[in-house]
Curated annotation (Swiss-Prot):
The organism's taxonomic lineage, starting at the top: Eukaryota, Metazoa, Chordata, Craniata, Vertebrata
Pfam families named among the record's database cross-references: Pkinase
Modified residues (Phosphothreonine): 14, 160
UniProt protein name: Cyclin-dependent kinase 2
Entry EC no(s): 2.7.11.22
């Protein structure tokens, strides 16, 4: 750790404090994530170290690069490339004008490229949300915290006792499915796509049941005909209210037909039928994709 000079605290992630820091040797600015583990007494689990070390191999322009893993007695520091802003802050600052459609399209396309790459390496994210999508002034967007969920688990609360958001969580996870697939990340990205378009969260639930019911009220309560096996999931209840599906044109009115079609395929209940990142990249919505520069106020 001696080779890094902390510049300032830039945030509090799910697992610990994040600092902007400078590598004293190279002069490079990095993001230092200090991982707080409950196992303070036992030190860092070796499984976590192994998992995290594998992530150093994930090299892709739309994945935040993990430069190094620094392991001291019972602390773990992850050294990441530094980016100026996250998508949540950018959306919050763009509430008046919103994010332009070409920029939404570019961001979604880039995020799908990052997802397709990770999924092809059998790495899931499991906790995608606007806070861990990072942007720069060149128009790039990158996925942060990839693979951390598998190494450390997704806690119910952060180390500062903040509730970890459920807004982007796939229905199969909410219904108690223990074995899930890359499709959970596509669901999360679908929710983020809608939020970039409408400027408000698609399903802002405040508990697991509220989260499920918000999804059901919009997409209809799922049954065996549209999602085979749903009624035998651990947390499925036959007493769930039966809501009818709403038309997506009412849910995301600014979006054109191609955009609605893609969103609909990202939000399919049955994870086996949900579109993959690879197939989403060739959807006609992206036939005119460009890479505009965001109006960043850094």
């Amino acid at each position: 750790m001696e080779s890094f000079q902390k510049v300032e605290k830039i945030g509090e992630g799910t697992y610990g404090v994040v600092y902007k820091a400078k590598n004293k040797v190279t002069g490079e600015t990095v993001a230092l994530k200090k991982i707080r583990l409950d196992t303070e007494t036992e030190g860092v689990p070796s499984t976590a170290i192994r998992e995290i070390s594998l992530l150093k191999e994930l090299n892709h322009p739309n994945i935040v690069k993990l430069h190094d893993v620094i392991h001291t007695e019972n602390k773990l520091y992850l050294v990441f490339e530094f980016l100026h802003q996250d998508l949540k802050r950018f959306m919050d600052s763009s509430t008046v004008t919103g994010i332009s459609l070409p920029l939404v399209k570019s961001y979604l396309f880039q995020l799908l490229q990052g997802l397709a790459f990770c999924h092809s390496h059998r790495v899931l994210h499991r906790d995608l949300k606007p806070q861990n999508l990072l942007i720069n002034a060149q128009g790039e967007i990158k996925l942060a915290d990839f693979g951390l969920a598998r190494a450390f688990g997704v806690p119910v609360r952060t180390y500062t006792h903040e509730v970890v958001t459920l807004w982007y969580r796939a229905p199969e996870i909410l219904l108690g499915c223990k074995y899930y697939s890359t499709a959970v990340d596509i669901w999360s990205l679908g929710c983020i796509f809608a939020e970039m378009i409408t400027r408000k969260a698609l399903f802002p639930g405040d508990s697991e049941i509220d989260q499920l019911f918000r999804i059901f009220r919009t997409l209809g309560t799922p049954d065996e005909s549209i999602w085979p096996g749903v009624t035998s999931m651990p947390d499925y209840k036959p007493s769930f209210p039966k809501w009818a599906r709403q038309d997506l044109s009412k849910v995301v009115p600014p979006l054109d037909e191609d955009g609605r079609d893609l969103l609909g395929q990202m939000l399919i209940y049955d994870p086996n039928k949900r579109i993959s990142a690879k197939n989403a990249l060739v959807h006609r919505f992206f036939r005119d994709v460009t890479m505009p520069v965001p109006p960043l106020r850094l």
